[in-house]
């Protein structure tokens, strides 16, 4: 049997992390079995579905490299097919027309609630032989079995059973002629030959209804697996107040797709004690029976730790391709300065996100207007003039501009003046970067370049002289 899974988002907003994890699990299961992964857009909610949301979902999928083998299919383009199946069910007697008014249904609901009963349709039109005009408004309901129960073996939760008496005669076509969500899903899974439906636990109550419709159509019933929800670190359902929940917001915040994927796969699934997984390892090891039944808590610190790991573990040239976007957001002109791959090597240890990296690298490429006030007050004092003049002259004398030779020049200055490295290094750092913190000074000065470094030291010396004149 060829394994076929699907990811079927409703395009009413962005791709959130819960949806992305469901997509990832479906994708991994298909890849693990050499099967196919289908993308289906469930856009039957015409009022809330937007083209922007469809684009945002695909952007998120593409950024995570969760490529689909079939689709995207759109439910709104399949209405003829759904209606043909409904007409067939009406003929076969597995569905019926219901003419009950909203007022009657509301009164029925209130009566049932008052008795403490679960509100459900009472089947009046199911057994009615009244004649109605062809143009009289009606809905179409599925004639749900009235006896027995529906049992399915959830691949994550084990056997789940629903009594048919608890299930309603579901509306499958509205008065305006449009088919309903639960019905469209069934026909899609049948037509697309989906073998495994992996989705959120909020769909568990839909499953028995969908199974009954599939059986009425004499269609194969797929295997179901319902993934638990994701909570924030406070135990409440993950939402915007916990920070980013959209996949592309994580991109904007400077996360690598590898870090988010690795984090999401471990959010409810495990393979021994392993924390770091390549894409190939995820595919190789992923099984549904290792997915947890209990809710997962989203931990941003853990994601940040993973991101820092991947910034340093992945090839710098690759990380640089993702960094480029963030550099553009900061409007930094990188034509004069180190290659971005070299920048990744320079700043990788210090920066946990690419956004942080882009925001802290400007001095490598552009001259700064002024020194950081606190750093200048502390380190650009008259006592720093001599160390800066001596180190400037030694840097000027370098013919082979390497980080090693820069280091020798700084060391030689400290030796000559008989002071600690900090007495040379700190003023030099503020002079060339404008700030009190940077990567190792030798590689920083080397990356900034000889001409620019010497110009900046002269600027710092002028700053010191100006301060002296003011006192």
Swiss-Prot record:
Kindly list the GO CC terms recorded for this protein: cytosol
InterPro entries hit by this protein: aa-tRNA-synth_I_cd-bd, aa-tRNA-synth_I_codon-bd_sub2, aa-tRNA-synth_I_CS, aa_tRNA-synth_I_cd-bd_sf, Glu-tRNA-ligase_bac/mito, Glu/Gln-tRNA-synth, Glu/Gln-tRNA-synth_Ib_cat-dom, GluQ/Sye
Q: Where is this motif: 'HIGH' region?
A: 9-19
Query: What cofactor is this protein dependent on?
Result: Zn(2+)
Q: Its function? A: Catalyzes the attachment of glutamate to tRNA(Glu) in a two-step reaction: glutamate is first activated by ATP to form Glu-AMP and then transferred to the acceptor end of tRNA(Glu).
Positions annotated to bind ATP: 240
The alphabetized UniProt keywords are: Aminoacyl-tRNA synthetase, ATP-binding, Cytoplasm, Ligase, Metal-binding, Nucleotide-binding, Protein biosynthesis, Zinc
Annotated protein name in UniProt: Glutamate--tRNA ligase
The gene designation is gltX
Question: What is the residue range of the motif 'KMSKS' region?
Answer: 237-241
